[in-house]
Amino acid sequence: GIVLCTARMNRIISCDEEEMSVLVQPGVTLMELNEYLAERGLRYTPDPGEKTATIGGNAATNAGGPNAFKCGSTRDNVLSVRAVLPSGEVVQLGCDVRKCNDGYNLMQLLLGSEGTLAVITELKLKLCPAVKAQMGFILPFDSLESCLSAAGRLANSGLSPETLEFMDDDMIAFSSS
């Protein structure tokens, strides 16, 4: 096997605030990207738990996090990628615009493939305005079934929560220790 480190491919190449997109190399960490975007009143919505994870790693695993309920996983927030195929060919996949309906979406196949199909060298990501205010709730449920039922009703209610996170007794005990 081959181990490839993209840690030095860590540049934020450009940010288009009007188009609400950012072009990054795969070694940029989620924390670095979020700090950069916060200064511009923007944010990248996928929010997996590990803030030192790289954007390339998030793309390779199609990471999501609690915000995936409303904002989607990494796959839903990548406009385009540049990648190197095993043959050495460099390909540009996806579109540089938010709506793109032409042909097969090979980029979607690449995202989540864990590096088995290509090496990602650049990603153009969708951005959103930074959140001005937030509110959180912790709701206890007697059973998994009642929790899932409430989540389904919430999803169909017309309300639009950005984050839903399920924690069972073991996870609560672990996070409390």
Q: Model-predicted segments: where are they?
A:
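Glycine-rich loop at the start of a catalytic domain that most often binds anionic cofactors/ligands
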Residues: 1-4
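Terminal amphipathic helices with adjacent charged low-complexity linkers/tails
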Residues: 162-177
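FAD-binding subdomain of flavoenzyme oxidoreductases
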Residues: 11-165
